[in-house]
């Protein structure tokens, strides 16, 4: 059993080092401005978010991702600023820390029509525990493991700066269409300099909300506490692709959602969301169920907490949707 776990972890580590793939959440719409820096300040108020994901929990050394964020509007809600910190840990071997700031500017094109432009800058602090790794040349024909390897790494840590840009079109806060590019300069991410770059990630997303109680469509100017929401997202980073579609309903104070996620090849996941909110507090739980034969540890969990400062006037849109 331990050999099987070790083999799985070795393959996973090789996959991460080879592709330099970003972490991902099942529901980025409750992970503030994680898909597009243009979505900074989209809640139209002060917003604090904390998100946690545990992946492959059936393995001995699983995968943990944590993100903390803050964003708000300034200057008549046309300018928005935000800051975030994320921590991504694979087993006890590979750890990624990212801290960054983001800015978005809203341009009014016509009544109810807006364009948002966003820019994000961040710094990465990556660490790998070289002492916990065993390389191929350390295995002898007798089954013994020699203490040293000929593999040469300059350092077990890596620090570099990164940038992202994004844009979105918003119609009355009911329909949002956006596109973003992360790792614009494709920074060097390797522990041996010049051998690995962090590939650009391209993101496209569409979000729609339909009021249920008041029968308001795209041209309504407000929302009741009951509404339907839907989301389409596509991400691509080098050879890695991910597409998902999600939908759900909100009946105050309960929010329910379901989504389907796929890498467009072999790995498919169905996610279920249960959420609730009271005044400015929101709490969500997401369960991922792998439906393909490549189960990668079978299932995953996500927990998200969001607090939004109550508005002095009625918000024009629900703060969060799937």
Regions found by a protein language model. Name each.
Residues 1, 20-21:
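Absolute protein N-terminus
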Residues 1-5, 109-111:
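Positively charged n-region of N-terminal signal peptides that target proteins for export
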Residues 5-6, 24:
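Generic extreme N-terminus detector
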Residues 7-8, 18:
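Cleavable N-terminal signal peptides
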Residues 12-13, 185:
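Short, glycine/serine-rich, charged loops/turns that create anion-binding
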Residues 13-20:
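Sec/Tat signal peptide C-region and signal peptidase I cleavage site
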Residues 21-322:
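Subset of outer-membrane beta-barrel
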């Amino acid at each position: 059993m331990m050999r099987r776990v070790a083999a799985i972890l070795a393959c996973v580590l090789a996959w991460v080092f080879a592709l330099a793939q970003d972490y991902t959440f099942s529901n980025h719409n409750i992970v503030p401005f994680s898909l597009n820096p243009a979505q900074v300040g989209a809640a139209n108020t002060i917003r604090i978010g904390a998100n946690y994901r545990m992946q492959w929990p059936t393995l001995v050394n699983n995968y943990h991702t944590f993100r903390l964020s803050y964003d708000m509007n300034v200057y008549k809600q046309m300018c928005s600023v935000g800051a975030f910190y994320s921590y991504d840990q694979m087993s006890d071997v590979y750890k990624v820390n990212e801290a960054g700031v983001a800015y978005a500017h809203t341009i009014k094109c016509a009544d109810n029509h807006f364009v948002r432009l966003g820019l994000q800058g961040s710094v990465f602090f990556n660490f790998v525990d070289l002492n916990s790794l065993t390389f191929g040349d350390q295995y002898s024909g007798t089954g013994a493991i020699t203490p040293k390897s000929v593999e040469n790494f300059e350092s077990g840590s890596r620090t570099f700066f990164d940038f992202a840009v994004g844009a979105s079109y918003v119609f009355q806060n009911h329909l949002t269409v956006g596109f973003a590019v992360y790792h614009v300069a494709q920074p060097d991410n390797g522990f041996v300099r010049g051998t690995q770059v962090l590939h650009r990630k391209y993101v496209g997303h569409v979000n729609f909300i339909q009021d249920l109680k008041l029968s308001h469509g795209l041209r309504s100017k407000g929302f009741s506490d009951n509404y339907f929401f839907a989301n389409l997202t596509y991400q691509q980073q080098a050879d890695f692709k991910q597409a998902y579609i999600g939908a759900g309903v909100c009946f105050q104070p309960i929010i329910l959602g379901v989504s389907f996620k796929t890498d467009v090849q072999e790995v498919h996941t169905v996610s279920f969301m249960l959420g609730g909110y009271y005044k400015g507090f929101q709490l969500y739980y997401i369960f991922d169920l792998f439906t393909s034969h490549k189960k990668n540890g079978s299932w995953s969990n996500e927990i998200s907490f969001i607090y939004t400062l109550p508005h002095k006037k009625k918000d024009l849109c629900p703060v969060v949707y799937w």
